[in-house]
């Protein structure tokens, strides 16, 4: 089964300094049909104006992933990290027993565009941690997150994998799905056809009870593929 979550059907909140689209229920957007998918709890598509950002705030027992599409994030947290995360890089933070952090757009002229993704951990009370790494190949499937941090990926405390998949126009490829696993695909840019379902920039696809994904790039495209545990 494939369910297409159209970009324009997501929750939307424009605060002036922040324009945010919510794939799943978040803040003032609530839809009981969209509370998450497997271990995914939040996929927010955020544009943050120059010089603006999220002030220091707490988190606990959540894996928080940021993928920067345009601009740079300035990250600061209660572990003593103060980092710049430019476009093309992923940042993972395990909130665990508790962490406080801020995320700002340090530019005075350029907007910041990013995905903020929350993943429920397998267990609560883990030690907080922070990592960032660049994954920006022009073509191919790169492993970004995995439980064992293999092949240069970032570690995530959940039985899941995340791939960043860049495809050139007319490229056709297949991704096998293990029994009972669930897959979420987020289209970062471009136009793709997945098992006959067409999807475009910012669309999402929930996939279950399928043995494989056949993906065709109708234009140069990039998707995030989450291989997730059974519910």
Curated annotation (Swiss-Prot):
Swiss-Prot/TrEMBL keywords: Copper, Dioxygenase, Iron, Metal-binding, Oxidoreductase, Zinc
Keyword Iron assigned: yes
Note on how the cofactor is bound: Binds 1 divalent metal cation, Zn(2+), Co(2+) or Fe(2+).
Pathway(s) where this gene product acts: Flavonoid metabolism; quercetin degradation
Gene Ontology MF annotations: metal ion binding; quercetin 2,3-dioxygenase activity
Catalysed reactions, semicolon-separated: quercetin + O2 = 2-(3,4-dihydroxybenzoyloxy)-4,6-dihydroxybenzoate + CO
Binding of a divalent metal cation, residues: 57, 59, 101, 103
EC number assigned by the record: 1.13.11.24
Record note on domains: Is composed of two structurally similar domains arranged face to face.
Note: Quercetin is a flavonoid compound synthesized by a variety of plants, including foods for human consumption.
Family named by the database record: Belongs to the pirin family.
Function as written in the Swiss-Prot or TrEMBL entry: Has quercetin 2,3-dioxygenase activity in vitro. Its physiological role is unknown; however, may provide a mechanism that would avoid inhibition of key cellular proteins, such as DNA gyrase, by quercetin.
Full protein name: Quercetin 2,3-dioxygenase
Organism expressing this protein natively: Escherichia coli (strain K12)
């Amino acid at each position: 089964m494939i369910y297409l979550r159209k970009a324009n059907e997501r929750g939307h909140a424009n605060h002036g300094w922040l324009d945010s689209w919510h794939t799943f229920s978040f803040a003032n957007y609530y839809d009981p049909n969209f509370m998450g998918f497997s271990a995914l709890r939040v996929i927010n598509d955020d544009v943050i104006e120059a010089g603006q950002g999220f002030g220091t705030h707490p988190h606990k027992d959540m894996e928080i992933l940021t993928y920067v599409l345009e601009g740079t994030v300035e990250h600061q947290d209660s572990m003593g990290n103060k980092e710049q995360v430019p476009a093309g890089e992923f940042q993972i933070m395990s909130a665990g027993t508790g962490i406080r952090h801020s995320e700002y757009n340090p530019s005075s002229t350029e907007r910041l565009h990013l995905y903020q993704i929350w993943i429920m951990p397998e267990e609560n009370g883990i030690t907080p941690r922070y990592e960032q790494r660049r994954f920006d190949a022009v073509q191919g499937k790169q492993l970004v997150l995995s439980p064992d941090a293999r092949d240069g990926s970032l570690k995530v405390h959940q039985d899941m994998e995340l791939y960043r998949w860049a495809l050139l126009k007319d490229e056709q490829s297949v991704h096998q799905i293990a029994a009972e696993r669930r897959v979420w695909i987020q289209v970062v840019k471009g136009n793709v056809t997945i098992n006959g379902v067409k999807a475009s920039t910012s669309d999402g696809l929930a996939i279950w009870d399928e043995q494989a994904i056949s993906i065709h790039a109708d234009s140069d495209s990039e998707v995030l593929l989450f291989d997730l545990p059974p519910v």
